[in-house]
C-alpha cells in the first residue's frame, strides 16, 4: 500500500510539473535587443575559427567563421556581456556598452583556467576547482570509429584505465579509476549523462557528446554518495545555441582487418610433424585440403556511421535534435551491430530570463549478433587437412577429438545469438530565479531499457544435434523513475566582489524495477522457425521456463558549499545522505562527507613579479564515498528458492527451501580518499599540467562467505568484511612545442602509477584465508586456478607452480616444500597482472588548413598469462588436433600445466590512434559554414615482448564469465576474439 501511495504521489508530481513545463514552453518575454558583430583574434592577431561567443547569463551564442568573424543579436546592447572561449585559450568577458562592433583578443593557455567544467549538480571554472577533476573536450577525443564514450576517452585521463580486450563489436570496454576497490563485479565509475546519474554510455551516440568530465577523488565525487566509490564520469551532450539555425552532418566508412592471428600449423607443417614422429596420418588426410580456419571465420569488416543534427535558437530559447545510424560489422562473420540513436533538447526562457524550462529525450534501438567464442576454440584445434565443405557442398562434420563441437564455419552460419535492445528516456526541468543568485530547480526523468536475447542451435550442427535443435528466448526490462529538487545560491560580495559563495541543497528520489522472462525448448521438427516458435518443440524440461522481478528505491539529501576569495583561497564542503532499500535493516542510511581546499599561489602579491609562472595552485581534499551497485536487491533478507519437484497424490508439486540467509547488517562498501594535487601553467601557457598523489582506502568490502550450518540454514552469506587500499601518483603534462601563425605542435603526456593491496579479508564472524580464482581453461589442466586473493597481496596476484625452464620436453618445476613431489602445495607468487605504470602520449599538429594527430598508449610492468600457448603449443593431442607452429609443439613430452613458464611480460606501447584532416575554405560558399575531410587509423601496431596475440587483455574480467570479475586479470583467454586494425574515411559538414 505504501509503495502504491509513493507511485501515486510521484505521478501527481510529474503531471503538475510537466503541465507547468508545457504551459511555458510557448512563452517568450519581450526584451530590447540589438545586433553586435566583430572578430576574434589570437595573441598574434590571427583570426580564430570556431571560437564560441555567448551572451553571459544566457545560452544565446554563435561561433566564428573561417575569418574569425561573428554576429550575434543580444538582449540589451547597453548591458550585454560577451563571453568568448576557444580550446587552448583563456575565456574572457567583454562588455558591449552599446557598441555594434566588438573585437575580442584571446590569450593562449594550455590549461584553460576560465574553462567551465561540469562537477556534478553544477559547474565551476577550472581556476576555482578544489577537487581532482579531469575534463576532455570534443577536440581531444579519440578519432575514428567509436562505439561509445569510453572509446573517446581511452588513454586520455591519467588514472582511468579503459580496456577493450576483445574484438567483439557488441561488447563494451571496462573502466576502472585509480585501481580496483572491490571484490564485486560492479566496480566501474558512476555514469552521469546531462545531470542524470546511473546512465549507460552505449545509449549516447559519440557525435552527440560535447565534453566528458571525470571526478577522480572522493571530495569531488562525494555528492553522489553511495554510488561513487569507483569515481564519476560526467557526460555533457551538445545543445543548441545562437540565433542561426545550423545543420550538421558527420559521416564515415570504416574497414576492420584482423590485427593479429594465431600462427597455427598449415597442412604441410602438420604433415611434416607427423612424418618426423613416424605417425600414420592417413586416416585424417583424405581430403586434399589446406584450410586456415581463422581465415574462414573472419572477414574485412565494413562499417558506416551517419549523424545529422539540427540546432539553433534565439535570445530566449535554444534547441537541438539529432539522429545517428551506426552499422558496425566486425571481423568475425557472425558479429555485427546496427544502432539507431535519436536525441532532442529544447530550452525556453521567460519572465525576464528568470524562468527556464527544458525538455529532453532520447531513444536508442540496437540489433546485434553476438559471436560464439567456442568457434574460435575450434579454429585453434581443427586440423588444416580438414575441408570446410564436402565434395557435394555439404558441411564437413568429422568429429574433432579434442572438442566435440563440429565444424566452426557450420556453427557460425547456421546457429544464431541475437540481442535486441530498446532504450528511451524523457526528461523535463523547470528552474526559477527567486531573487538574484537564488534558483530553485526541479527535474523529472523516466527511462526504460529492454533487452531481448534469442538463441538457436540448428539441429544440423554438432552443437544442436544432441537436442535436435535448441531454442532460447530471454526478455529483460529495467524501468527507472527519478525526481530531483535543488536550491542553489551564487553571490559575489565585498567592495571589490572578490568574495564568492556558491551553495546548493538537493533532494533526490528514485525507484528502479527489473523484470525478466526466460524460456527454452528443444526437439524441433524443422529449423526454419529458429527461435520464433518455442511452443513447437517437444523437449520441454523442468527449469525451462522462468520469470522474476525485483525493485529497489533510493532517497537522498545532499548539500555543497564553495567559497573563494580573489581566486586565492578556496574551500568546498559536501555531504550526501543516502537511504536505500538494498541495505539491511540496521543500516538503511549512509552519510558521505567531503572537504577540499585550494590555494592559488600565483595570485599572491609575492608572485606577481614571477613572470614565467602564469598559474600555480595547490589542492588538497578528503572525502568518503560508497558502493552499493555490487549489492543486489533483497540480499539482506531470508529468501526461499525452488529445490525440486515431487509427485504427491496424483499431482506434481514444487518443493522450496531457504536459499539465502538474512543479514540485517548488510550495507554499502565505503571508500575514503585523501588527494593532494598541484596545478601549474608556465612560460605564457606553453607548459602546463597537474601532479597528484592519492591514498584510497576501501572498507566493509562485500563478499560471499562460507558459514556453518547450523546455526545458519544456508551455507553461504554475503557480508561486509574486507579492506583494501590503493595509493598512487598521476602526472599530466601539456606542452606547446611550436606556436606561431601557420604551424602549431601541441604535446600531451599522462602517466599514472597505482599500488593495490588487500589489507583484510576476514573477521570474527566471517573468515577465509585465501580466495583462489581464475581458471585459465587449459586443456589437460581444467579446474586449476591461476590467481589468489589474500591479505598483504594485490588483486591480480598470479599464484601457480614456479617453472624455471623445460628440459627434455618436461617442465622443471620448483619443489618448494621439499617433499619430493610436485603438487598444489608447491604453488607460489609468481607475478602481478596490474601494471606499474600506465601512460598516454598525444601529439597534435596544425598547418594552415591541415590537422594531424597521433596517440600512443601503453603499460609497463604487468604480467600476462599466455593461455593459448599453454593450451596449443603442445603435442599431447597431436595428430588428432592442430597446434601452434611453436618450438614447444615439437619438443614437449607432457601435458600442459598452469605454471609460470607461460607468464610473460605484458608491457606494451600501442599506436592507438592516428588522424589526418583537411578543412576547406568555405567563405565563398554562403550556404556552407564548414567542410572537413579526414582519415583515421586505429590500432596500427603494438611494440611488445609478449608472444601471444595481444598483451592488452581484459584487465578486470574473468576468463569465461564475470563471476570473479576483477579478481583474475591478465589472462589471454582461449575464447579470444581477435582485435581489429581499423581505417576510417570521414567527412564533417556544417550548413
Where is each model-derived feature located?
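Extracellular/periplasmic, surface-exposed regions of secreted and cell-surface proteins
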Residues: 29, 141, 188, 194, ...
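Exposed, low-structure sequence patches enriched in small/polar residues
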Residues: 506, 560-562, 750, 797-806, ...
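Short aromatic-centered micro-motifs
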Residues: 53, 84, 191, 389, ...
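C-terminal extracellular loops and terminal segments
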Residues: 150-154, 718-725, 766-798, 830-840, ...
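C-terminal beta-barrel architecture of Gram-negative outer-membrane proteins
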Residues: 818-820, 852-911, 949
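Glycine-rich, aromatic-lined ligand/substrate-binding cores of catalytic
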Residues: 832-864
Amino acid at each position: 500500500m505504501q509503495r502504491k501511495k509513493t507511485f501515486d504521489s510521484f505521478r501527481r508530481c510529474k503531471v503538475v510539473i510537466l503541465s507547468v513545463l508545457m504551459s511555458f514552453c510557448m512563452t517568450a518575454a519581450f526584451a530590447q535587443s540589438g545586433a553586435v558583430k566583430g572578430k576574434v583574434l589570437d595573441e598574434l592577431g590571427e583570426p580564430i575559427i570556431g571560437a564560441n561567443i555567448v551572451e553571459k547569463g544566457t545560452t544565446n551564442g554563435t561561433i566564428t567563421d573561417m575569418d574569425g568573424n561573428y554576429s550575434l543579436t543580444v538582449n540589451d546592447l547597453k548591458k550585454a556581456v560577451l563571453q568568448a572561449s576557444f580550446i587552448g585559450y583563456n575565456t574572457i568577458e567583454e562588455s558591449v556598452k552599446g557598441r555594434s562592433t566588438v573585437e575580442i583578443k584571446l590569450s593562449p593557455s594550455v590549461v584553460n583556467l576560465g574553462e567551465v567544467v561540469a562537477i556534478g549538480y553544477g559547474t565551476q571554472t577550472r581556476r576555482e576547482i578544489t577537487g581532482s577533476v579531469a575534463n576532455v573536450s570534443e577536440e581531444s577525443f579519440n578519432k575514428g570509429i567509436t562505439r561509445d564514450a569510453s572509446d573517446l576517452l581511452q588513454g586520455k585521463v591519467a588514472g582511468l584505465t579503459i580496456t577493450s580486450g576483445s574484438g567483439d563489436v557488441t561488447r563494451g570496454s571496462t573502466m576502472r579509476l585509480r585501481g580496483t576497490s572491490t571484490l564485486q563485479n560492479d566496480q566501474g565509475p558512476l555514469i552521469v549523462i546531462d545531470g542524470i546519474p546511473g546512465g549507460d554510455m552505449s545509449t549516447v551516440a559519440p557525435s552527440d557528446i560535447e565534453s566528458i568530465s571525470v571526478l577522480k577523488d572522493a571530495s569531488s565525487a562525494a555528492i553522489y554518495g553511495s554510488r561513487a566509490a569507483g569515481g564519476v564520469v560526467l557526460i555533457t551532450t551538445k545543445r543548441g545555441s545562437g540565433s542561426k539555425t545550423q545543420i550538421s552532418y558527420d559521416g564515415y566508412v570504416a574497414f576492420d582487418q584482423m590485427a593479429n592471428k594465431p600462427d597455427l600449423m598449415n597442412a604441410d607443417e602438420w604433415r611434416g610433424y607427423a612424418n618426423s614422429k613416424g605417425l600414420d596420418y592417413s586416416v585424417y588426410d583424405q581430403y586434399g585440403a589446406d584450410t586456415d580456419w581463422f581465415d574462414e571465420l573472419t572477414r574485412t569488416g565494413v562499417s558506416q556511421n551517419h549523424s545529422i543534427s539540427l540546432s539553433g535558437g534565439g535570445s530566449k530559447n535554444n534547441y537541438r535534435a539529432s539522429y545517428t545510424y551506426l552499422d558496425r560489422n566486425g571481423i568475425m562473420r557472425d558479429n555485427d551491430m546496427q544502432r539507431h540513436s535519436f536525441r532532442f533538447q529544447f530550452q525556453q526562457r521567460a519572465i525576464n530570463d528568470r524562468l527556464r524550462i527544458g525538455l529532453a529525450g532520447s531513444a536508442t534501438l540496437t540489433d546485434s549478433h553476438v559471436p560464439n567464442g567456442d568457434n574460435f576454440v575450434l579454429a585453434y584445434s581443427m586440423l588444416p587437412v580438414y575441408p570446410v565443405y564436402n565434395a557435394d557442398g555439404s558441411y564437413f562434420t568429422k568429429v574433432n577429438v579434442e572438442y566435440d563441437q563440429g565444424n566452426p564455419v557450420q556453427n557460425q552460419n547456421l546457429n544464431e545469438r541475437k540481442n535486441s535492445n530498446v532504450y528511451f528516456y524523457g526528461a523535463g526541468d523547470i528552474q526559477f530565479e527567486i531573487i538574484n543568485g537564488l534558483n530553485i530547480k526541479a527535474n523529472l526523468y523516466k527511462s526504460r531499457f529492454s533487452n531481448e536475447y534469442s538463441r538457436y542451435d540448428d539441429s544440423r550442427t554438432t552443437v544442436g544435434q544432441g537436442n535436435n535443435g535448441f531454442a532460447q528466448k530471454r526478455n529483460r526490462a529495467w524501468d527507472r523513475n527519478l525526481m530531483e529538487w535543488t536550491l542553489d545560491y551564487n553571490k559575489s560580495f565585498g567592495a571589490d566582489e572578490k568574495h564568492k559563495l556558491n551553495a546548493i541543497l538537493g533532494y533526490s528520489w528514485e525507484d528502479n524495477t527489473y523484470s525478466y522472462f526466460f524460456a527454452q525448448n528443444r526437439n524441433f521438427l524443422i529449423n526454419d522457425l529458429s527461435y520464433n516458435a518455442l511452443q513447437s518443440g517437444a523437449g520441454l524440461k523442468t527449469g525451462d521456463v522462468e520469470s522474476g522481478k525485483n525493485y529497489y528505491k533510493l532517497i537522498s539529501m545532499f548539500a555543497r558549499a564553495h567559497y573563494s576569495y580573489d581566486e586565492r583561497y578556496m574551500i568546498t564542503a559536501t555531504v550526501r545522505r543516502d537511504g536505500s532499500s538494498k541495505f539491511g535493516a540496521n543500516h538503511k542510511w549512509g552519510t558521505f562527507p567531503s572537504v577540499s581546499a585550494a590555494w592559488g599561489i600565483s595570485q599572491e602579491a609575492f608572485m606577481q613579479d614571477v613572470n614565467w609562472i602564469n598559474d600555480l595552485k595547490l589542492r588538497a581534499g578528503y572525502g568518503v564515498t560508497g558502493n552499493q551497485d555490487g549489492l543486489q536487491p533483497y540480499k539482506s533478507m531470508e529468501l526461499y528458492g525452488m529445490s525440486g519437484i515431487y509427485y504427491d497424490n496424483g499431482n506434481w508439486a514444487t518443493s522450496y527451501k531457504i536459499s539465502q540467509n538474512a543479514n540485517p547488517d548488510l550495507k554499502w562498501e565505503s571508500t575514503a580518499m585523501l588527494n593532494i594535487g598541484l596545478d601549474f601553467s608556465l612560460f605564457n601557457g606553453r607548459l602546463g599540467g597537474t601532479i597528484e598523489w592519492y591514498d584510497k582506502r576501501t572498507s566493509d568490502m562485500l563478499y560471499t562467505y562460507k558459514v556453518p550450518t547450523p546455526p545458519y540454514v544456508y551455507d553461504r552469506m554475503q557480508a561486509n568484511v574486507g579492506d583494501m587500499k590503493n595509493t598512487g601518483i598521476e602526472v599530466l603534462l601539456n606542452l606547446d612545442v611550436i606556436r606561431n601563425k601557420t604551424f602549431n605542435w601541441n604535446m600531451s603526456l599522462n602517466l599514472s602509477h597505482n599500488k593495490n593491496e588487500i589489507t583484510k579479508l576476514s573477521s570474527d564472524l566471517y573468515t577465509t584465508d585465501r580466495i583462489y580464482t581464475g581458471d585459465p581453461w587449459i586443456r589437460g589442466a581444467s579446474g586449476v586456478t591461476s590467481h589468489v586473493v589474500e591479505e598483504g597481496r594485490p588483486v591480480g596476484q598470479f599464484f601457480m607452480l614456479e617453472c624455471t625452464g623445460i628440459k627434455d620436453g618436461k617442465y622443471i618445476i620448483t619443489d618448494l616444500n621439499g617433499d619430493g613431489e610436485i603438487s598444489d602445495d608447491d604453488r607460489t607468487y609468481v607475478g602481478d597482472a596490474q601494471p606499474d605504470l600506465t601512460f598516454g602520449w598525444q601529439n597534435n599538429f596544425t598547418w594552415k588548413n591541415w590537422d594531424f594527430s597521433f596517440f600512443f598508449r601503453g603499460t609497463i610492468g604487468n604480467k600476462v598469462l599466455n593461455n593459448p600457448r599453454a593450451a596449443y603449443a603442445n603435442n599431447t593431442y597431436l595428430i588428432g588436433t592442430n597446434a601452434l607452429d611453436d618450438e614447444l609443439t615439437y619438443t614437449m613430452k607432457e601435458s600442459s600445466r598452469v605454471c609460470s613458464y607461460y607468464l610473460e611480460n605484458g608491457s606494451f606501447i600501442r599506436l592507438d590512434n592516428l588522424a589526418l584532416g583537411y578543412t576547406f575554405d568555405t567563405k565563398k560558399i554562403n550556404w556552407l559554414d564548414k567542410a572537413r575531410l579526414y582519415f583515421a587509423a586505429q590500432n596500427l601496431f603494438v611494440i611488445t615482448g609478449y608472444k601471444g596475440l595481444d598483451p592488452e587483455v581484459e584487465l578486470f574480467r574473468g576468463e569465461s564469465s564475470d563471476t570473479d570479475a576483477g579478481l583474475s586479470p591478465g589472462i589471454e583467454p582461449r575464447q579470444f576474439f581477435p582485435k581489429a586494425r581499423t581505417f576510417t574515411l570521414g567527412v564533417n559538414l556544417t550548413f
